[in-house]
Structure formats: C-alpha cells, structure tokens
Amino acid sequence: MPTMNTSMQGKICLVTGATSGIGKATALGLAQMGATVVMVGRDREKGEAVQREIKTKSGNEAVDLLLADLSSQESIRQLAEDFLQRYTKLHVLINNAGLISLRRRETVDGLEVTFAVNLLAPFLLTNLLLDVIKASAPSRIINVSSASHEAGYINMDDLQLEGHYRYLRAYGQSKLALVLFTYELARRLQGTGVTANCLHPGFVASNFGQNGTGPISRAVVNLIFSSFGISPEEGAKTSIFLATSPEVEGVTGKYFVKSIPKRSAPITYDESLQRQLWEESARLVKLPMKV
C-alpha cells in the first residue's frame, strides 16, 4: 500500500466532494504526495477555507478549487468546461461526492436527487472528461460506492422512485448503479490505458447528510453514521490506494474494500443490466450512447 512518501509529482487529480469527509481527507493525502489536486466543492467560502488548510498541512501550493452543484447537469457541464480551460491532463478522477436525502426531492433537471448526484453526476462528469483522461494514460477513474449497494436493487422502470420512496432504498439503488456503471465503463475502456474501479470506504463518521434535506434530517443521518463510523482519514485510504499504488496499475473493473479486491453483489456482474443502465443514464443526461 502506498505511503505518504509515494510521489504523485506531475500528476493531476480531480476529487469531487473534496471540502469535507472522505473527499477532504483524500485531497489532503494526494496533496501530501505532491499531486496537483483539483478540489470540487459547492460553497466558495467553505471550499477556499479547506483549500488553504490543505495547502498549509501538505506544504503543496498546487491545490485548486472548482465550484459545482452536482445535482445540476448544467453545473456539471460548466465544471468540465472550467477544468478543461485550466488543464490539458487528468491522471486521476475520483468521483467521491454523494448524498442521502430522507425525503424524495427532484433536481432542477426533474430527477430524483439521490440518483442524480450519486450516479448521474459521476456518469456525466466522467464522460465529459474522458478525452483528456484517455490522453493522459495511464490514468485512473475511481468511483466511491458503498457496501450498501449489496442491499440495493434496480427497477429500470422506476429509477426515479416515483412509485414509493424510501431513503435507504434510494441510496442502495444509487450505489448499486455506481458499481454497474464502473464495470461497464471498465469494459468500454479496455485497451485505452485508463482503468476504472470502485470501492466501499467503510461507514465514515462525517457530515454525510450535508446535501440531504433540512438540519434535522442531516442530524439524524449524521447520528446514525457517527455512532459506529470510522474516521474520514481511514475511509480515504482505499481511494488514495487506488489513485496512487503501483499494485493496481492496469487493474480495472474491480470493487475494493480496505484496499483489497472483493466480490460485489451478484447482480452487478449482469452485463445486460450494465449496458441497459448505461444507455438510460446517457439518455437522462443527454449524451450519445457511447464512450
């Protein structure tokens, strides 16, 4: 497993959800290894404070901040445009941002917010940045899923959960979908020098519900996670491992727990479902149905 002595000098890494929790710990770890870290956050004031903190703690000035609302497809497209205006390479993309919403809400695009942020945002951002990721090969795409995917199931006729909404059902579905997306992406990227893997970070004691509903809902979610959760630093270890370790050079289409490849839920290996979900995701974000 890489240590903080592992050099990421010259590598450009983009981390979503980088202003708190696992994302913040991941961004700090990569900065300490010498990477150029591009943080993605939603709030400028908070983002700039975390940016300064990471620069100070890491001694690395190459820490950038881009702002985006990952529940908005327009904002995601602007994020990709902003990145491509500043950078010509992207060696590591970590789709870390995620949320739980205790009640059903729709985004500005009319989509259920958990599915939109936890799956469609990574799907859209990855595809928008894919050309520069390929041009930077060997490069890595890392999707932060959850063991909760094992309790999830997907009804392709009701991905937006319009029939009956339960927040754990919505979360499990979104994280299951993220594993399916990862495996389909890995297959489509074979031979390009780009790998795609996903992971369970552990149940992390952090402000996970920050993008959920109101303060009471956030408090409930945070209480659940903080009562038995690990630290964000511990939770970031597998993301950092997949981003930096020579041990996983060329390894793709895998699900990792504690930096070890594990079997994901049986349904995630259904290639027909992987393709079907890809095509529906492409339709929902208005992308051509190809890499």
Identify the residue ranges that each predicted region occupies.
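A glycine/serine/threonine-rich, flexible loop-to-helix segment
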Residues: L159, A205-L223
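A short, mixed-charge helix-start or loop-turn motif at secondary-structure junctions
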Residues: T16, G163, Y167, V221-F225, ...
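C-terminal helical subdomain
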Residues: S174, C198, N222-R263, Y269-R275, ...
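Rossmann-fold NAD(P)H-dependent dehydrogenase/reductase core
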Residues: M1-F208, K286-V291
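A non-catalytic, amphipathic alpha-helix used as a structural packing/dimerization or gating element
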Residues: K46-A49, Q276, E280
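Hydrophobic alpha-helix feature that most strongly marks membrane-spanning transmembrane helices
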Residues: Q190, T213, T244-E247
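A short small-residue
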Residues: A31, R218, I260-S264
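Short glycine/threonine-rich loop-to-helix capping motif typified by GTGT followed
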Residues: Q210, I267-T268
